[in-house]
């Protein structure tokens, strides 16, 4: 298992909230919780930035963190990420903040400690481009957006 450095930004993590953790032994994502003083209401169509109370430093250039929505929040309540996906670069050292967007028809209340998103770590391959005049032809070619249906 890879070790990632985490810094506690908000001391309530020790007393009232938890560090991100896997819900099950087969979980791909670590649950991120809302580090709030009091419940926060997100009205339909609105977004809010929510603190997690922690910062991470991945440091390994071959790994990135990805913040993803929790499927149940999106399906049941219309709560998704305001930026759809949050990408955490290996050299970022700031606090993890989650942008929640209520795309549902009803207000949604985020309670302190509520699991609001998940953090997944992924391998990264950095590339460099080689400029060419043409590509070797393939069966698909340049056809996109629904061409392979």
UniProtKB/Swiss-Prot annotation:
The entry's substrate-binding residues are 70-72, 83, 87-89
Gene Ontology annotations of biological process type: dUMP biosynthetic process; dUTP catabolic process
Annotated HAMAP family = dUTPase_bact (MF_00116)
Highest taxon listed in the record's lineage: Bacteria
Instruction: State its role.
Output: This enzyme is involved in nucleotide metabolism: it produces dUMP, the immediate precursor of thymidine nucleotides and it decreases the intracellular concentration of dUTP so that uracil cannot be incorporated into DNA.
Q: Which cofactor does it need?
A: Mg(2+)
What the entry lists under InterPro entries is as follows: dUTPase, dUTPase-like, dUTPase-like_sf, dUTPase_trimeric
Q: What does the record give as EC number?
A: 3.6.1.23
Q: Which Pfam families match?
A: dUTPase
Q: Which organism is it from?
A: Blochmanniella pennsylvanica (strain BPEN)
Chain ranges passing through the membrane: none
State what protein this is by name.
Answer: Deoxyuridine 5'-triphosphate nucleotidohydrolase
Q: In which pathway does it act?
A: Pyrimidine metabolism; dUMP biosynthesis; dUMP from dCTP (dUTP route): step 2/2
Q: Which family does the record claim for this protein?
A: Belongs to the dUTPase family.
Q: What is the lineage of its organism?
A: Bacteria, Pseudomonadati, Pseudomonadota, Gammaproteobacteria, Enterobacterales
What keywords tag this UniProt record?
Hydrolase, Magnesium, Metal-binding, Nucleotide metabolism
């Amino acid at each position: 298992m890879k070790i990632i450095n985490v810094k506690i930004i908000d001391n309530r993590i020790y007393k009232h909230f938890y560090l991100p953790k896997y819900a099950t032994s087969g979980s791909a994502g670590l649950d991120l919780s809302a580090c709030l003083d009091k419940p926060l209401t997100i009205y339909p169509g609105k977004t809010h930035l929510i603190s997690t109370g922690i910062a991470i430093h991945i440091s390994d250039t071959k790994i990135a963190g990805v913040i993803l929505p929790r499927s149940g929040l999106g399906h049941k309540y219309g709560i998704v990420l305001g930026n759809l996906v949050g990408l955490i670069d290996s050299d970022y050292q700031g606090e993890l903040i989650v942008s929640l967007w209520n795309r549902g028809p009803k207000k949604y209340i985020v309670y302190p400690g509520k699991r609001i998103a998940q953090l997944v770590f992924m391998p990264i391959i950095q590339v460099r481009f080689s400029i060419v005049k043409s590509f070797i032809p393939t069966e698909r070619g340049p056809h996109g957006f629904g061409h392979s249906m």
